[in-house]
Amino acid sequence: MTGSNSPAAATDFFHDAPSLPAVPETPVRKFNINFGPQHPAAHGVLRLVLELDGEIVERVDPHIGLLHRGTEKLMEARTYLQNIPYFDRLDYVAPMNQEHAFCLAIEKLLGVDVPLRGSLIRVLFCEIGRVLNHLLNVTTQAMDVGALTPPLWGFEEREKLMVFYERACGARLHANYFRPGGVHQDLTPSLIDDIEKWAKAFPKICDDIEGLITDNRIFKQRNVDIGVVTKEDALAWGFSGVMVRGSGIAWDLRRNQPYECYNDFEFDIPLGKNGDCYDRYLCRMQEMRESTKIILQAIEKLRATPGPVMTQDNKVAPPRRAEMKRSMEALIHHFKLYTEGFRTPEGEVYACVEAPKGEFGVFLVSNGTNKPYRCKIKAPGFSHLAAMDWMNRGHQLADVSAILGSLDIVFGEVDR
């Protein structure tokens, strides 16, 4: 068949098509977003600038300093006693643990001994602080990945502990209870009984919280194999506390470099195996149980140890109220102690405690006056936050809040 209606021949399809102009390749720009500083999962005033390739995190840039108050500089203009309240405002989730480090540093400088009863009360409240911290962290970490009930239960328990704080020193949060040489005042027998009653009931609360989230499929999917830290990495980044114990390193200052009277207590150090967010969560849960054991032992020892809670060294201890009503010298001594303060010998000391978040250290330099020449605060959260970029690379965007939650960051101590 010929003509316009004839079927196409195979050769008709091989004619040269006109060449099209080359399309320039569009450069793909990385996606930058801000996480915080007003973000419910940011655990304080943290600003993260995230660089994303789709859903994959390529870079995390933490911007800190939004809660900087110049604590270390302010301390240089105040007496040692006036500086104790500053430590309550660092890690404000567990205030007394920070006071402890500062008091230990002053006691090292002065060579002052703490009476056994005062030492036991310190241990008791440091462990209450550990429970306060871990309750908040574990339950809000669950909230960060979608659970609503655990934080409600956690805050209910924390409220009971806050009441114990209030009954011991009059303040729910900023305690100002630890003093160089001991603690401010003794505990009443009824308070000791109530703490014991709480400590005996608390393991059941831990079981309830674990029943909600430990084997929860969604919680495990969001935390297992997320934010893995190997032993070598933990040491290289200068981690401490749960961040190293979650990776399987048995390092706890209460056991490795005992201070106060921790040598007299029986407790275990929980260790993780994989170094991921889930292992760190399990470590914190078990640490709360161990702290409860220490609390019960401390209460037993307190009942068997009557005596003073403050050193009898007049250089740092104020006179008793009854004595001030009788003696003019006692009144003058009290006035001088609280206005001028005590003087420390020249020197440098470093004191550290196993705070709930890790090793909290105080490097104190004295020039022989009544005020510190320099006080350098070593906050555990600072080292942990520094690794945020390295820990998040290659993870999904949704994993950022899970990793941040497992680092346990509080900005009072990071920004100081």
Curated annotation (Swiss-Prot):
Has the keyword NAD been applied to this entry?
yes
Disulfide cysteine pairs (residue numbers): none
One Gene Ontology MF term: NADH:ubiquinone reductase (non-electrogenic) activity
The family database entries (InterPro entries) matched by this protein are listed as: NADH_Q_OxRdtase_suD, NADH_UbQ_OxRdtase_49kDa_CS, NDH1_su_D/H, NiFe-Hase_large
What compartments host this protein?
A: Cell inner membrane
Identify which top EC class this enzyme belongs to: translocase
Q: Which GO terms describe its cellular component?
A: plasma membrane
Assembly and partners?
Answer: NDH-1 is composed of 14 different subunits. Subunits NuoB, C, D, E, F, and G constitute the peripheral sector of the complex.
* Main function: NDH-1 shuttles electrons from NADH, via FMN and iron-sulfur (Fe-S) centers, to quinones in the respiratory chain. The immediate electron acceptor for the enzyme in this species is believed to be ubiquinone. Couples the redox reaction to proton translocation (for every two electrons transferred, four hydrogen ions are translocated across the cytoplasmic membrane), and thus conserves the redox energy in a proton gradient.
Q: What does the similarity note say?
A: Belongs to the complex I 49 kDa subunit family.
Stated name of the protein = NADH-quinone oxidoreductase subunit D
Record organism: Caulobacter sp. (strain K31)
Q: Which gene encodes it?
A: nuoD
